Amino acid sequence: MKNKLIAKSLLTIAAIGITTTTIASTADASEGYGPREKKPVSINHNIVEYNDGTFKYQSRPKFNSTPKYIKFKHDYNILEFNDGTFEYGARPQFNKPAAKTDATIKKEQKLIQAQNLVREFEKTHTVSAHRKAQKAVNLVSFEYKVKKMVLQERIDNVLKQGLVR
């Protein structure tokens, strides 16, 4: 009876000891994964400058053959790799407005001319103005499809009224 009691008490003490050590070890491990105090600000000739004013020289040994992959992306476009080195990331892409070529300028001029001729046809209601306006609308590029349809509808509305001299 005494042996069973001693065995049970030893087992409970061992179980309590194991649980306390695991809780303590997980608490220590969780401290490393929180927000970092040091964040890299700039990199110049393999020297990393941190936000607290400290510097660190970084080098990747030649014999280190493990593949590099991005572990963390910091501010200022700085990447941290799995081997502890830092590098600037790819430059962000900015879409610059394309310079207008001569062809696009000519297409825009044809559209403006067609708009003016349709406006003139709406005022005068003459056959010659209709022919000029219709020809100009037909020459408008397919890139201005919606505007071309609007101009054609304006011509059709004037023709529906009748009264073309």
Swiss-Prot record:
One of its GO terms (cellular component) is extracellular space. Disulfide bonds: none annotated. One of its GO terms (molecular function) is complement binding. The keyword Secreted applies. Keywords: Secreted, Signal, Virulence. Residues 1-29 form the signal peptide. InterPro entries: Efb_C_sf, Extracellular_fibrinogen-bd_C, Sbi_C3_db_domIV. Pfam families: efb-c (PF12199). Interacts with host fibrinogen alpha chain/FGA. Interacts with host complement protein C3. Extracellular fibrinogen-binding protein that plays an important role in virulence. By interacting with the alpha chain of fibrinogen and its derivative fibrin, enhances a non-functional interaction between fibrinogen and platelets and is responsible for repression of fibrinogen-dependent platelet aggregation. In addition, assembles a fibrinogen protective shield around the bacteria which results in impaired phagocytic clearance by the host. This is Fibrinogen-binding protein. It comes from Staphylococcus aureus (strain Mu50 / ATCC 700699). The gene is fib.
